[in-house]
Swiss-Prot record:
MF terms (GO), sorted A to Z: ATP binding; phosphoribosyl-ATP diphosphatase activity
One Pfam family, short name: PRA-PH
Enzyme type, top EC level: hydrolase
Official protein name in the record: Phosphoribosyl-ATP pyrophosphatase
Pathway the protein contributes to: Amino-acid biosynthesis; L-histidine biosynthesis; L-histidine from 5-phospho-alpha-D-ribose 1-diphosphate: step 2/9
Biological process (GO), any one: L-histidine biosynthetic process
Primary residence: cytoplasm
Taxonomy of the source species: Bacteria, Pseudomonadati, Rhodothermota, Rhodothermia, Rhodothermales
Alphabetized UniProt keyword annotations: Amino-acid biosynthesis, ATP-binding, Cytoplasm, Histidine biosynthesis, Hydrolase, Nucleotide-binding
The species this protein was found in: Salinibacter ruber (strain DSM 13855 / M31)
EC numbers on record: 3.6.1.31
Amino acid sequence: MKRFEELFAELADKVDRQDPDSGTVQAVQEGRHAIGKKVIEEAGEVWMAAEHEGPDRTAEEISQLLYHLQVLMIACDLDLEDVYEHL
């Protein structure tokens, strides 16, 4: 099981290294618009899971949304501290 900070560090490292086998690197290369569309899609799936599919499926969908939000953060050159300042 990964923690939020651990996942962010792993994703940022893949992007820094330009890992050719990484879907994260590919997503960042596709740009903010494509990532943003994925964030919207995943947010809708979280909502639908919460309404109709129960806690386990909701947790799974939330984890996918958090992943895509982290990818968007990396694409925007934000780090966790940038976000934590606003919590």
